[in-house]
Amino acid sequence: MARYIGPKAKLSRREGTDLFLKSARRSLADKCKLDSKPGQHGRTSGARTSDYGTQLREKQKVKRIYGVLERQFRRYFAEADRRKGNTGENLLQLLESRLDNVVYRMGFGSTRAEARQLVSHKSITVNGIVANVPSQQVKAGDVIAIREKAKKQARIIEALSLAEQGGMPSWVAVDAKKFEGTFKQVPERADIGGDINESLIVELYSR
């Protein structure tokens, strides 16, 4: 399955909520009707969505938020299920610990897609070592930094400025002047927030 490269707003409308695929700081709510499906008049249906359909939609939504494809998502779920504790929370913590997501959370990219591109283009280091795998799992204490050659990129400077205005998550510590941040700890479920019902995904894979 190829990665979706079409209009990002369409995905948010399909899920009925802003997935922040365009920007973490600018909501789509004022630009398009998130409560109507894609299409000129929005798709309507009188049929009630089945439990399976609801669970599937939730999985699709989370996959789109984090930019993860099906096979990789299944691997994340399998790992989350093997770990102790709540499987749904484990899943979200694994996704939040991805390098591209941490780069995004630190404000170096305005979207996860942009953060993923920074990693793929070798603009990021982890503990001083160049990293180019977006799915790399970041561990507590790891230091993420922008490479010297990329520090003058306007998109990084703008994204970081907007992130500073909006506030950073409590589980990262960012030094904007040095273009680096520390992954303090794996976030707790309450720290992740978002319009996500991970229990629906657990129910889906438990069928």
Curated annotation (Swiss-Prot):
Q: What does this protein do?
A: One of the primary rRNA binding proteins, it binds directly to 16S rRNA where it nucleates assembly of the body of the 30S subunit.
Q: Which residues form the S4 RNA-binding domain?
A: 97-160
Name of the protein in question? Small ribosomal subunit protein uS4
State any GO CC term. small ribosomal subunit
A Pfam family (short name) is S4
> Biased composition, Polar residues: where in the chain?
42-53
Answer whether the UniProt record assigns the keyword RNA-binding to this protein. yes
Molecular function, one GO term: structural constituent of ribosome
| Record keywords, A-Z | Ribonucleoprotein, Ribosomal protein, RNA-binding, rRNA-binding
Taxonomic superkingdom:
Bacteria
**Which family does the record assign?**
Belongs to the universal ribosomal protein uS4 family.
Report quaternary structure and partners: Part of the 30S ribosomal subunit. Contacts protein S5. The interaction surface between S4 and S5 is involved in control of translational fidelity.
Q: Using the UniProt annotation, give all residue ranges assigned to the region (Disordered).
A: 31-55
Q: Tell me which Gene3D superfamilies the record gives.
A: Ribosomal Protein S4 Delta 41, Chain A, domain 1, RNA-binding S4 domain
